[in-house]
A protein has these predicted regions:
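Ligand-binding pockets and gating/stacking loops
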Residues: 1-247
Length: 247
């Protein structure tokens, strides 16, 4: 189900590397509205995954562990650690403070100018084949430069001050809230316009003792119309929806 959620495609049944699905709608959006932001898209999750081998009824784990597919053969793994998400959004700084961000952007630009100048001087002494390789490298550097310019234009955005997280919070509820805060800031700063957030990998069997449900989530979904199991599954659904209010 997870593999089809945003693709609308029945994935190929395989436990091997020959996976095949479809491009997900978030990545279609990223190809359009993601071109003008530093990050075309952001893939987030709240549970560690396995990306190899079989996970369910002859299907590869790749189908269970993400809902984002860049192409029919390219699943995009999600990031679960809020600290790494913060660093991807704001670099290796410790805060969203605008003064700190502006200083870091100037440092990045100075370094980029040095790299471009050095590479252009080197080009005069290279043969044709190496110059082509250098040209490809410079194209990549200029893409970085473009993204830095986009970031600089956004650095004046009024953002809530958020310090770099230490890592994954101890509870599911805190994890949801922190990831939601990061998504909100990413949207406010226009660092990306496309985000997927997967609460649990398919068949993940998370339990919800905080709301009095010790049963594994996936197991409850096979309730066989048992009223007690259906009631506990409903509690989980309500809990998930209630947490959206924080976002």
């Amino acid at each position: 189900a997870g593999a089809s959620w945003l693709t609308g495609v029945q994935p190929k049944k395989t436990r091997g590397a020959d996976i095949r699905n479809g491009m997900s709608v978030d990545q279609m959006l990223a190809e359009g509205i993601g071109r003008s932001t530093p990050l075309p898209s952001l893939e987030l999750g709240l549970q560690d995954v396995r990306m190899v081998g079989g996970c369910d009824s002859g299907y590869s784990c790749a189908y269970s562990n993400t809902i984002a597919w860049n192409s029919p053969t390219t699943p995009l793994p999600y990031e679960t650690n809020p600290r790494r998400v913060f660093e991807r959004l704001f670099g290796d700084g410790d805060t969203t403070d605008p003064v700190v961000r502006a200083t870091r952007a100037r440092q990045n630009r100075s370094l980029l100018d040095f790299v471009l100048g050095d590479a252009q001087r080197l080009g005069a002494s290279l043969g044709a084949g190496d110059r082509r390789k250098l040209s490809d490298y410079l194209d990549s550097v200029r893409e970085v430069e473009r993204r830095i310019q986009n970031t600089e234009q956004r650095d004046g955005a009024e953002l809530p001050t958020l310090d770099r997280p230490d890592g994954v919070p101890p509870t599911f509820e805190e994890h949801v809230e922190l990831m939601s805060d990061l998504v909100a800031i990413a949207f406010q700063a226009d660092l990306t316009r496309v985000v997927t957030l997967m609460y649990s990998r398919e068949g993940g069997n998370r339990t919800y003792r905080a709301i009095g449900v010790p049963d594994a989530h996936h197991g409850l979904s096979h309730h066989q119309n048992d009223p007690a199991r259906m009631a506990r599954l409903q509690l989980i659904d309500q809990h998930h929806v209630a947490m959206l209010a924080h976002f």
